[in-house]
UniProtKB/Swiss-Prot annotation:
One of its GO terms (molecular function) is dCTP deaminase activity. This is dCTP deaminase. SUPFAM superfamilies: dUTPase-like. Catalyzes the deamination of dCTP to dUTP. Keywords: Hydrolase, Nucleotide metabolism, Nucleotide-binding. Belongs to the dCTP deaminase family. Pathway: Pyrimidine metabolism; dUMP biosynthesis; dUMP from dCTP (dUTP route): step 1/2. The active site is at 133 (proton donor/acceptor). GO terms for biological process: dUMP biosynthetic process; dUTP biosynthetic process; nucleobase-containing small molecule interconversion. It catalyses: dCTP + H2O + H(+) = dUTP + NH4(+). Homotrimer. Its EC number is 3.5.4.13. The gene is dcd.
Amino acid sequence: MGLKADNWIRKMALEHKMIEPFCEANIGKGVVSYGLSSYGYDICVGREFKIFTNVNSTVVDPKNFVEENVVDFEGDVCIVPANSFALARTIEYFKMPDDVLAICLGKSTYARCGIIVNVTPFEPGFEGHITIEISNTTPLPAKIYANEGIAQVLFLQGDEKCDTTYKDKKGKYQAQTGITLPRILK
């Protein structure tokens, strides 16, 4: 399994629409960096957020998630409360090749501020916006800047194609747009 370089990422984005919109440069002056890097792609967080709240005294249950667990926010700067959590989405829409798995890692700019970003792997054949999990581990409110970098995606090409892609198995988050809350297939 090999890590893919900028020239491969550029070709796949421009010729096969693997990443849309796609930024060929790495933009970093005055912003949290985003765009193409040497061996990855720095994704941008969109303007829509779902911030977890305890106002309704609900319990977070991944098997029975209720919308009352979150409040919707849209804007250029999202304040994630102290020791709290938010969901967001990428600006970019991904179409993963059938022999490529992507891993997403948080950016050091946010990590050094106590902001931890989690994204599960983008499986071969996956298509959609990426839902981003943002955890504020600090005792202070924290800012997340929309339309700027939030994490870096690394692309790993398998030595051989898998038998069943995410698309083949009709994955529950396939073709998701916007922020997608937890789903359990029934």
